Swiss-Prot record:
Active site: 100, 196
Classification via NCBIfam families: PRK00143.1, trmU
The protein, known as: tRNA-specific 2-thiouridylase MnmA
Record field: catalytic activity: S-sulfanyl-L-cysteinyl-[protein] + uridine(34) in tRNA + AH2 + ATP = 2-thiouridine(34) in tRNA + L-cysteinyl-[protein] + A + AMP + diphosphate + H(+)
Residue ranges of the region described as Interaction with tRNA: 146-148, 308-309
Keywords from the UniProt entry: ATP-binding, Cytoplasm, Disulfide bond, Nucleotide-binding, RNA-binding, Transferase, tRNA processing, tRNA-binding
Entry GO terms, CC: cytoplasm
Length: 363
């Protein structure tokens, strides 16, 4: 019987490298695939893709597997980046990593791998898949500090049935130890952070290349004008840094936080103090719902949800407004709920799916 063929997405980082190594040790026929998803202003100053490809090739050589490089930049721009810009233009705060996983890493990549005769694809995500009576469940990674199921909630049954997450049961320290013990040259390489196509460049500088500035007033809830903002797209709910209005104006010496973005009036509302009531929301409305099993979770049940990556699970309930919109009510008010971000629902360690935060609700 021939070995099952797995195409591994190799980024040049330690996680995907160890994923490829483990699959090779488990007896799979492994092919490495380096994805280039961005070309605009692809300079060494801000983008590490050239070095990442070199690192991936070095690892593939040590493991003894072939490595192919493929360019998905056109697909990325059409399916991910255009949505990213549209959301910022509308005053929301999108999460492109979620869409990149669903549209590029587990769609364009999966299609390409099928053309290579792959039985499965694999990545270095900290997540797990469990087949329960023919239903594929997405589980949290064992390392709670690195769990990436939040970014994978849009994956469907067809995608999960072909997906392997070889390091999902490991802790990060163990991944680095395995890499070092097996002589992988990138065992100590720093983890990548931030949005992949922005790299190390300042976010405001990058966004201004694609969207024009639209300055407006910064106000308090009572209407006092505190200053001017450079454009609502540069701010997100809960933001403290970069407001340009100081930390002591207003009388009580507490720092200022963004509490609301009014796109119609082009007004940025700020409040003083991390625990200001206007920063807390007991409920939210979510749209563009995606459920991993293909079935909507039942109502009248206690679940847990995350409104941002690495947030602690927050107990909640779900009420469906229609088949593509729901209300999520929390047991405790949530801080800085940002429209455009993803809300992801869990039942214990199982990621059920989620949606995009459309609005916050006060009651």
């Amino acid at each position: 019987m021939s070995k099952a063929r797995v195409v591994v997405g190799m980024s040049g980082g330690v996680d995907s490298s160890v994923a490829a190594l483990l699959l090779k040790q488990q007896g799979y026929e492994v092919i490495g695939l380096f994805m280039k998803n961005w070309e605009d202003d692809d300079t060494d100053e801000y983008c590490s893709s050239r070095q990442d490809l070199i690192d991936a090739a070095s690892v593939a050589d040590v493991i003894g597997i072939p490595l192919e490089a493929v360019n998905f930049s056109a697909e990325y721009k059409e399916r991910v980046f255009s949505h990213f810009l549209a959301e910022y233009k509308a005053g929301r705060t999108p999460n492109p990593d979620v869409l990149c996983n669903a549209e590029i890493k587990f769609k364009a990549f999966l299609d390409h791998a099928a053309g290579l005769g792959a039985d499965y694809i694999a990545t270095g995500h900290y997540a797990q898949v469990r087949n329960t009576d023919g239903v594929f469940q997405l589980l949290k990674g064992e390392d709670g500090t690195k769990d990436q199921s939040y970014f994978l909630y849009r994956l469907n049954q067809a995608q999960l049935s072909r997906a392997l997450f070889p390091i999902g049961h490991l802790y990060k320290r163990d991944v680095r130890s395995i890499a070092k013990d097996h002589g992988l040259p990138n065992f100590s390489k720093k983890d990548s952070t931030g949005i992949c196509f922005i790299g190390e460049r300042p976010f405001r500088e990058f966004l201004n290349r694609y969207l024009p500035n639209d300055p407006g007033e910064i106000r308090t809830p009572s209407g006092d004008v505190m200053g001017r903002h450079a454009g609502l797209m540069y701010y997100t709910i809960g933001q403290r840094q970069g407001l340009g209005i100081g930390g002591t104006r207003g009388g009580d010496g507490e720092p200022w936080f963004v509490s609301e973005k009014d796109v119609k009036r082009n007004v940025l509302t700020v409040v003083q103090g991390h625990d200001h009531p206007d920063l807390l929301r007991p409920a939210l409305a979510a749209t563009d719902l995606t459920w991993v099993s293909g079935k909507m979770p039942r109502c009248n049940w206690v679940y847990a949800a995350k409104i941002r990556y690495r947030q602690s699970d927050a107990p909640c309930s779900i009420t469906y407004l229609d088949c593509n919109k729901c209300k999520i009510e929390f047991a405790q008010p949530q801080w800085a709920v940002a429209p455009g971000q993803s809300v992801v629902v869990y039942e214990s360690k199982v990621c059920l799916g989620g949606g995009v935060i459309a609005a916050t609700q006060d009651d």
